[in-house]
Design a protein with these regions (language model features):
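Beta-propeller domains
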Residues: 17-37, 59
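Short loop/turn segments immediately following the C-termini of beta-strands
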Residues: 21-23, 56-57, 88-90, 121-122, ...
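Short loop/turn segments immediately following beta-strands, especially the blade-tip
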Residues: 130-137, 219-227
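Beta-rich, blade/repeat-based domains predominating
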Residues: 3-21, 42-57, 68-89, 97-117, ...
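Structural signal for beta-propeller blades
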Residues: 26-28, 91-94, 125-128, 177-178, ...
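Loop/turn-rich, solvent-exposed surfaces of beta-rich toroidal or solenoidal domains
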Residues: 125-126, 130-132, 145-182
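Beta-propeller fold detector
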Residues: 1-2, 36-42, 65-68, 97-99, ...
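Short coil turn/linker residues within repeat-based beta-strand modules
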Residues: 32-34, 94, 124, 134, ...
């Protein structure tokens, strides 16, 4: 059985499943509730995604070192072809495999076409949008997505975010999962009886959400986009 005393975020995995860490162990969870123990984390090691861990400012993929010198990293997204984007305070060692974003806090999502990324911003209604060029440079960061908030502008994004293949952004917040369109406007809020959503993972057409030590799953018509499966175009919403 799964240990649901989860530390950190939940993350998408292959075949519509998700992974998470609890008490230094990494679990794989299916939509039908089947749970499998995958591995044990080392002391000081943090799960950052499927097969991704961070320890002593060093990023690992399936136990192999990817890059070091990543100080204050809060989120990592794996792209295709061995590339990564990391939200960190700074990068002290240049690495061609990892593009570092220093604007924003806590959470990171990559647009399906790889043209921009979105990061969290504390004590505001907004999320930050940053253009990514083909060389991995981060350009022109600015507040863009506007979230609903009942705390008078003191919202800190509760957990992580994900795009679907239509380019809509799903954000875990105290009000529930807020779904924003291409123009940065929230078009829907998926609320849960358990209250605030602390984290989410969009894997295939299954949307997983964590509320404290409870995990809910909903089968969606939309399909989550996992950045490591490659860039894809999507139709403009105007």
């Amino acid at each position: 059985p799964c240990d649901l005393s989860i530390s950190g975020d939940i993350y998408p995995a292959a075949d519509g499943k998700m992974v998470f860490a609890a008490n230094n162990k990494v679990y794989l969870l299916s939509a039908d509730g089947t749970c499998q123990l995958l591995s044990t984390l080392k002391i000081g090691e943090q799960l950052m995604g499927e097969g991704l861990t961070l320890r002593s400012n060093t990023l690992y993929k399936d136990g192999q070192k990817v890059a070091d010198g990543l100080r204050g990293c809060q989120a990592v997204q794996e792209l295709s072809q061995g590339k990564y984007v990391a939200l960190c305070d700074e990068q002290t060692k240049t690495n061609s495999h990892v593009a570092v974003l220093t604007e924003g806090t806590r959470t990171l999502a990559i647009a399906p076409d790889y043209r921009f990324c979105v990061s969290g911003q504390e004590n505001t209604h907004h999320l930050i949008s940053t253009i990514m060029d083909k060389k991995g440079n981060m350009l022109y960061s600015e507040p863009f997505y506007y979230l609903h908030d009942l705390t008078n502008g003191t919202l800190a994004t509760a957990g992580n975010m994900a795009f679907d293949t239509n380019g809509n952004l799903y954000v875990s917040t105290p009000l529930g999962v807020q779904v924003a369109d291409h123009n940065g406007r929230v078009r829907a809020i998926l609320s849960l009886p358990a209250g605030a959503v602390h984290s989410l993972a969009f894997s295939g057409n299954y949307l997983y959400v964590r509320c404290g030590e409870k995990i809910f799953v909903r089968q969606m018509k939309a399909i989550g986009h996992n950045p490591k499966h490659g860039a894809m175009s999507y139709q403009s919403q105007g």
